[in-house]
Regions:
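GST-like domain detector, emphasizing the conserved glutathione-binding G-site
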Residues: 1-138, 237-241
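Generic N-terminal initiation segments characterized by hydrophobic and/or small/turn-forming residues
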Residues: 76-79, 85, 146, 153, ...
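Residue-level recognition of oxygen-bearing side chains
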Residues: 77, 202, 215
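GST-like fold's C-terminal all-alpha helical module
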Residues: 94, 101-212
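C-terminal anion-handling pockets and recognition modules
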Residues: 217-222
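Acidic/histidine-enriched, glycine/proline-rich intrinsically disordered or flexible terminal extensions
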Residues: 223-242
Length: 242
């Protein structure tokens, strides 16, 4: 039975981290909301699962994954579940926990990237909080992007198995998620990302290697890969970069 991924159909967002894992593993999955409405797709397909009174463990918000009777929300939790099944969580419990820790750190970085354009309220337009966004983005560019990427550089450099992967010598969902984080930063903050990446050669190498993996490469070239846009987490506003 195919996995069912439920996420907004027009953005990469947090669902993209799950998509990348499924695609890299060659897993059978359905991106439900991207199906035509006549096939049960569209954004309206998300609401019944989220508001299902018969499910005491319904997800708070997309993304969520359905695998038979199991419904899992939160990107990191979905990947914690999928990782061992897809062979993307390293070898053994210790690798699995380390992979999860890396994913949670990536989630922190993603949340901070989002807050650069919505620093006050997610319910207000960017234009209504632009002054605060300029201040938040400056701190993110100057301090937080380098801090996150430098830490991942250290993880790669200190990996006893070499600097090609974050965990051991095998591909994990943390590698794929770091690829997506770097891709997003390069889109939203091209100048700031370039400065930080100039000091993190192992991160740059991992990003390039992931892009060259056949399944990932094919996915990135396919219509299944939604382009970055200004409705997602990583948004390009020139005034926020520098």
């Amino acid at each position: 039975m195919a996995y069912q991924l439920h996420y907004w159909p027009t953005i990469q967002g947090r669902g993209e981290f799950v998509r990348l894992a499924l695609e890299a593993a060659g897993a059978d999955y359905v991106d439900v909301a991207r199906l035509p409405a006549r096939q049960g797709g569209g954004e309206t397909a998300l609401a019944p699962r989220l508001g299902d009174p018969g499910n005491p463990r319904a997800a708070f918000a997309p993304p969520f994954l359905v695998d038979g009777d199991i419904v899992i929300g939160q990107t990191a939790a979905i990947l914690l579940y999928l990782g061992p099944k897809l062979g993307l969580a390293g070898i053994g419990e210790s690798d699995g926990l380390w992979t999860h820790q890396l994913q949670l750190t990536i989630a922190d970085a993603v949340a901070e990237a989002h807050d650069t354009h919505h620093p006050i309220s997610t319910g207000d337009y960017y234009e209504d909080q632009r002054d605060a966004a300029l201040q938040r983005a400056r701190a993110f560019r100057e301090a937080r992007i380098p801090k996150f990427l430098n830490w991942f550089e250290q993880v790669l450099q200190r990996n006893p198995s070499g600097d090609l992967h974050l965990v051991g010598d095998v591909l994990t969902y943390a590698d794929l998620s770091l690829f997506q984080l770097v891709d997003g930063l390069q889109y939203a903050f091209p100048k700031a990302a370039a400065r930080a990446l100039a000091n993190t050669p192992a991160v740059v190498k991992l990003h390039a290697n992931i892009r060259r993996r056949q399944r990932v490469h094919d996915y990135l070239q396919s219509p299944r890969r939604i382009a970055f846009n200004e409705d997602g987490i990583f948004r390009r506003y020139a005034e926020l970069d520098g």
